Amino acid sequence: MNTALYLIDVTNRDGVQTSRILLPKLSKTMLNLYLDEMGVYQSEIGFPTLKHEINYINANLDLVKAGGIKRLHLEGWCRALPEDVELSFKNCPGLRHLNISVSTSPIMIQGKFQGRKTWKDVVESMYKSAKLAKQLGVVTLGVNAEDASRTDLDKLIEFALAAKEAGADRMRYCDTLGVDDPITIYERIKALALATKVPIEMHCHNDLGMAGAVSVAGAQGAFESNVDSYINTTINGYGERAGNCDLVSTILALKFSHALKAKIALDEHINLKTAWKIAKYASYAFNIPIPIKQPGVGANAFAHESGIHADGALKDRRSYELYDPEDVGRGEPELLETGRIITTGEYGGLKGFRHAYDKLGISFHNDSEARRILELVQYANLHTQKPLTDDELRFIANYPEIVQKILVVQP
């Protein structure tokens, strides 16, 4: 059986739950475009049950139809409740990929539900929700076991088999508190996958600094059990508390670790050369600096100072570097304009607007068309509360109707 490992990026759902951080809907859309360019399998785009997400989600589904997003699956997240599933499809009828989530550990069932639900109730609610999702047209369905790492293995097997019977395509094993270690999760996932033959999706948090190692180890356990495996990532590791498994670090580990690259077949569509672009944009959009030591994309990822290291790197970079800056899309000089600058935005006029777009090689048929795009640029600048990037300006010009829907938050 040919199995592979796929990446499901959850930046637009879990990453945006980072406390004290906001991400505009336009920025979420740009991340989906970059994830698609990177070859990532799926993006968890948000909550179809939330009113302020409806236009953004539907606009991104329109973007798929328009060919702006080519391969990336757009997946919504909701609770494993039939009423949530029903509301998701009422709000976003074009949704074809979904993950439904419920707590499975004794501490969460007791702590959250305060005696109102038992283990049997949890499984039954998940089963009914999964069946309904499939009936409503879901093509790929993931069923999430929240706090799986503190759930007994026999319970997880029961949960996964019930999900499989209901039509689920995979089970998400959530190490919600980052409590698992690589050896333990490898053993648990291998046993779970062998017992159920259900593809396993790893969702690991970084509370103990092991999210990447734990995710990869768990995926290896699934892979060795001859089922497809999935790793949830976020760009730059953003997420609740100490964050999630970092997208770029995970790809680097799977591509360049001597043992892993021989054991696990990473999705062939992954294009690592887009790493710098997506990490840099996410840092700008979230307003969170990239740590200087971040693998692949940090300022010091390819920096050498000590005598022995500098001498070795100059003679043969393989002495002290596993990969080249070019492998992650770095190495080219990035110019900073220091002379006269004409920008366009919230208070921009037609002349400055046309000048900015001329520099991008984009022209307009007439003033009427230009004024329409200018108005969207003004609203987009107000929406993001920061200067628009060149790629954002290009996107607005190419898909004005979709952008207009994204910028209207109230449905």
Regions found by a protein language model. Name each.
Residues 10-13, 48-50, 77-81, 101-105, ...:
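Active-site beta-loop-alpha junctions enriched in small/polar residues
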Residues 21, 46, 78, 149, ...:
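Hydrophobic alpha-helical scaffolding
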